[in-house]
């Protein structure tokens, strides 16, 4: 998905690329699945789920589209992948998910994994990361916020 969004954004721009991808996706859904029965969906789920989902997709698409280079797009995609760890944390904090002490090393290991991937073959160089963030701050900010939004989406929609 990261590659698709980045490739289309390079041709159509960040906003145009996102609009094209999601417009085409919507049309494909209508033709393959049909129109949803909106009245059968709980209003709270529809409102919260729609708001969070659309916000996340906007953050993801624009964060990839605004990345200055393809390498930054990969980094931004990895920043976005903080959402699984955040989802677990949110489920514990907000949904009362039962856990034990092993969750702490597990979450730390997940964070180290994201950092490891961000570092690539050369290792993690904080000066390069800071340089990339200062080059495209909006891109990294949107990816980071998107991770929190998607974790919130997973946590909130799980209640319905």
Where are these predicted regions, by residue range?
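Specific transmembrane alpha-helical segments of multi-pass solute transporters/efflux pumps
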Residues: 1-4, 34-80, 116
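Juxtamembrane helix-loop-helix junctions in multi-pass membrane proteins
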Residues: 1-25, 69-75, 152-160
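Transmembrane alpha-helical segments that form core, pore/gating elements
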Residues: 3, 25-30, 87-93, 125-160
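Juxtamembrane helix-entry segments on the extracytoplasmic side of multipass membrane proteins
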Residues: 10-19, 38-44, 119-149
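Specific alpha-helical transmembrane segments that line the substrate/conduction pathway
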Residues: 16-27, 65-96
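Hydrophobic residues within alpha-helical transmembrane segments
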Residues: 20-24, 47, 51, 82, ...
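Transmembrane-helix signature of multi-pass solute transporters
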Residues: 24-32, 59, 86-90, 109-116
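Hydrophobic transmembrane alpha-helices of multi-pass small-molecule transport proteins
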Residues: 29, 48, 99-122, 128
């Amino acid at each position: 998905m990261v590659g698709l969004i980045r490739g289309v954004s390079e041709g159509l721009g960040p906003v145009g690329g996102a609009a094209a991808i999601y417009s085409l996706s919507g049309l494909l859904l209508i033709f393959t699945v049909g129109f949803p029965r909106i009245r059968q969906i709980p209003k709270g789920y529809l409102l919260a789920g729609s708001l969070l989902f659309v916000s996340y997709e906007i953050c993801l698409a624009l964060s990839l589209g605004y990345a200055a280079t393809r390498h930054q797009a990969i980094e931004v995609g990895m920043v976005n992948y903080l959402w699984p760890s955040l989802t677990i944390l949110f489920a514990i904090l907000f949904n009362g998910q039962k856990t034990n002490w092993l969750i702490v090393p597990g979450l730390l290991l997940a964070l180290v994994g994201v950092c490891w991937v961000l570092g690539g073959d050369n290792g993690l160089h904080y000066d390069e990361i800071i340089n990339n963030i200062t080059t495209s701050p909006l891109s990294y900010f949107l990816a980071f916020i998107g991770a929190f939004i998607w974790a919130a989406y997973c946590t909130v929609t799980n209640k319905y």
